[in-house]
From Swiss-Prot:
Function: Sucrose-cleaving enzyme that provides UDP-glucose and fructose for various metabolic pathways.
GO BP terms: sucrose metabolic process
Family matches, as InterPro entries: Sucrose_synthase_pln/cyn
Keywords: Glycosyltransferase, Transferase
Gene Ontology MF annotations: sucrose synthase activity
Superkingdom as given in the UniProt entry: Eukaryota
Key word Transferase present: yes
Protein family (similarity comment): Belongs to the glycosyltransferase 1 family. Plant sucrose synthase subfamily.
Reaction catalysis annotation: an NDP-alpha-D-glucose + D-fructose = a ribonucleoside 5'-diphosphate + sucrose + H(+)
Enzyme Commission code(s) on record: 2.4.1.13
Enzyme category, top tier: transferase
Name of the protein in question: Sucrose synthase
Keyword Repressor attached: no
Length: 218
């Protein structure tokens, strides 16, 4: 995601910095922004402002050695490796605010990482709260921190809880994959095409009947 105000990628860092218990349980890994880009473009300038805020938070909360800041990845293989890393370390993936959601769900499901998601701007039926992930609001840090702490505490007390949430993502694979989406789209396209063809066949007869109706009831 872009490291700008809208995506709120500095939010997880601020949440973790304010909540000591969360820092004990997990280190944030932030994948955002183009670290090597310099531009006077308005959008790029805003992203540079995001970097300044991120570095400021890292200094303020003394995160050096406890955070990983990685440039946004265009390489799908490398993205898959990042998701796999989350899975291998029994971590949680937090969806950026206003970020395209369904594709991330599919990718995350492939490696079975437990997933948190931002609540107000995504369809709630994709992630069932407490079943296949957690509903969080990225703009309410105190509440989010408590949700994440509770999740990791449960995982530490019962390691099978992480697997339970992860396995809950099976419903995503059953209902929201691109394969299912494309199959449904093709089915609906075929149905529409047939309906359109039949409608054209009936159009002449309908006009003929309408003519007699107009003559009888002027």
């Amino acid at each position: 995601a872009r490291l700008d105000r809208v995506k709120n990628m500095t939010g997880p860092v601020e949440i973790s910095g304010k909540k000591a218990r969360l820092r004990e349980l997990a280190n944030p890994v932030i994948v955002a922004g183009d670290h090597g880009k310099e531009s006077k473009d308005r959008d790029e300038a805003e992203e540079q402002g995001g970097f300044k805020k991120m570095y400021s938070l890292i200094d303020d909360y003394k995160f050096k050695g406890h955070i990983r800041l990685i440039s946004a990845q265009m390489n799908r293989v490398r993205n898959g490796e990042l998701y796999q890393y989350i899975c291998d370390t029994k971590g949680a993936f937090v969806q950026p605010a206003y970020e395209a959601f369904r594709l991330d769900c599919d990718r995350v499901h492939e490696v079975r990482s437990a997933k948190d998601r931002d609540l107000p701007w995504r369809p709630c039926e994709i992630i069932a709260d407490g079943v296949s992930g957690l509903h969080i609001d990225p703009y309410h840090s105190d509440k989010d921190a408590d949700i994440l702490v509770n999740f990791f505490d449960k995982c530490n007390a019962d390691p099978s809880y992480w697997d339970e949430i992860s396995q809950g993502g099976q419903r995503i694979y059953e209902k929201y994959t691109w394969k299912l989406y494309s199959e449904r789209l093709m089915t609906l396209t075929g149905a529409y095409g047939f309906w359109n063809y039949v409608s054209k066949l009936e159009r002449g007869d309908t006009r003929y009947i309408d003519m007699f109706y107009a003559l009888e009831y002027p």
